[in-house]
């Protein structure tokens, strides 16, 4: 555990300045991080006409947890992707820091994509129209064979630690270009309009 903390601190250039321990039957970690920012991107800044993007794809954490709990036999490359999504998630911090000046609103997806989209819609007082499911073909094929629900895996999985963000249309080219430079997949999943809720 200590080595894991050390590795994460080195990778994300942060320091542990304190902590407290207690006794219990389960292992629980609560972490709080403080930092400075010259621009804070909130959950509530989206505007009518903004595009909705995610880094991604989604759904592998649901499958990874299913593999761990049920010991399912699937293709090796799909196992690797899914287990990595659960046991070693990688927040897209470089991408977020490089592009936050273009975002009108943003939130991480650790509580699930559906929860994130609904929270951003509520905070912005705007309707979010979702017209694309941010998943990969290999995942879709497997879930279909297993008669598992794609929407549930993608929108209600959680623990992906991806960025969900809105941008004015004029910045689409630059954020896509920056994603390619950093080799980070991003997916346009919808748009913002007048109204309430996620549709």
Q: At which residue positions do the language-model features occur?
A:
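Helix-biased detector of long, well-ordered alpha-helical tracts
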Residues: 1-199
């Amino acid at each position: 555990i200590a080595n894991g903390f050390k590795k994460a601190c080195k990778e994300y250039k942060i320091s542990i300045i304190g902590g407290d321990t207690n006794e219990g039957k389960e292992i629980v970690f609560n972490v709080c991080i403080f930092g400075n920012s010259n621009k804070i991107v909130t959950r509530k800044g989206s505007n009518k006409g903004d595009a909705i993007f995610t880094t991604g794809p989604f759904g592998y954490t649901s499958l990874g947890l299913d593999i761990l709990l049920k010991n399912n036999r699937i293709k090796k490359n799909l196992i690797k992707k899914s287990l990595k999504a659960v046991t070693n998630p990688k927040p897209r911090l470089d991408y977020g820091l490089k592009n936050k000046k273009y975002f009108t609103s943003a939130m991480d997806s650790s509580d699930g994509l559906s929860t994130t989209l609904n929270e951003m819609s509520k905070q912005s007082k705007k309707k979010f129209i979702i017209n694309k499911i941010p998943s990969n073909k290999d995942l879709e094929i497997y879930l279909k064979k297993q008669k598992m629900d794609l929407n549930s895996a993608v929108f209600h999985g959680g623990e992906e630690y991806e960025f969900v963000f809105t941008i004015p249309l004029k910045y689409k080219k630059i954020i896509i270009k920056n994603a390619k430079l950093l080799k980070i997949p991003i997916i346009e999943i919808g748009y913002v309009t007048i109204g309430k809720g996620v549709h």
